[in-house]
């Protein structure tokens, strides 16, 4: 690997202030060098295996699908150390930070999962972590805030704007503009300016690679579809990457429909957005007629982002991937169903993918194999869901 493409079709690019371009160029070169360095790869794989717990399991659902001739598998990223897929690429970027000779890490977080992953990687590798989090998210994700602080990270609440993920990204980028000589901005999703979408995809690629090997071992063939939730789109691109060149495998991303796509309260950037630039990349974003960024909404803090990674925008445009949307209510139902039927409490983000996969399974032909990326576990969401349901679960 000697060069990275900065765009996916028309999407992507590096739309940032000029003073950040040297930092992004340095990051791209460090990543290319690392990808070609067997020692870096060895250290990364050792951390993934011995610290994070890869490979993660693939579980056949026993009780969710009514048709016994349709198989629904769960790729268990919820079992990864840190509680979600986020740990994969954070370990990779933290190693890159050290490789560049930097001592500090800046990050943004929504649900707090990326923040937790950043905090644990920085604790392990001796880096100082500053994590920006929307004030609203600090309130609804209190356990993760305490986890981050417990592991030595500084958590900075952001009151600007709507006090959510978009605003946290703005503050993190502002910080990085002033400190990039000693700090690395550890972006948490497959969005943002080049080279972030490519780096994040490559550091999550093992999700799809393991899925391929596991399904071949269990079924002797590739799945008919892989399904993953999409906010910025990192867990989905990690799942999709190894299957993009396999036309027999449907790639299905699931966006948050919130209170319904007919309302203003959703986060479906591909489903309802238009093209534009946000956080350094050209992609589908939620904006009004004047180009002002609209507030995204989802019951799940981690999907509450008003744009989508540029490779997803491209996969949508060329028809290689399909993007559906699932409402809060559908996701909450799937959250409870998996808990009650299988004893696995999924993250609200992952519950969106599960809800859509269950609908697919209901309509699927005999012999269909579907894999859902269970991107995280639901511990962080228990208090939030408890308050929504008023302590009642839907029997």
From Swiss-Prot:
Residue positions, PTM N6-(pyridoxal phosphate)lysine: 86
Question: Which pathway does it take part in?
Answer: Amino-acid biosynthesis; L-tryptophan biosynthesis; L-tryptophan from chorismate: step 5/5
Cofactor(s) the record lists: pyridoxal 5'-phosphate
**What EC number(s) does this enzyme carry?**
4.2.1.20
- Molecular-function annotations in GO: tryptophan synthase activity
Recorded hits in Pfam families, A to Z, give: PALP (PF00291)
Record InterPro entries: Trp_synth_b_CS, Trp_synth_beta, Trp_synth_beta/beta-like, TrpB-like_PALP, TrpB-like_PALP_sf
GO cellular component annotations, sorted alphabetically? cytoplasm
Coiled-coil residues = none
Q: Which reaction does it catalyse?
A: (1S,2R)-1-C-(indol-3-yl)glycerol 3-phosphate + L-serine = D-glyceraldehyde 3-phosphate + L-tryptophan + H2O
Keyword terms, alphabetized: Amino-acid biosynthesis, Aromatic amino acid biosynthesis, Lyase, Pyridoxal phosphate, Tryptophan biosynthesis
Q: Which NCBIfam families match?
A: trpB
* Family statement drawn from the similarity comment of this UniProt entry: Belongs to the TrpB family.
Matches recorded under HAMAP family: Trp_synth_beta
Q: What does this protein do?
A: The beta subunit is responsible for the synthesis of L-tryptophan from indole and L-serine.
Q: How does it assemble?
A: Tetramer of two alpha and two beta chains.
Q: Could you identify this protein by its name?
A: Tryptophan synthase beta chain
Give the classification, highest ranks: Bacteria, Pseudomonadati, Pseudomonadota, Gammaproteobacteria, Alteromonadales
List the gene name.
Answer: trpB
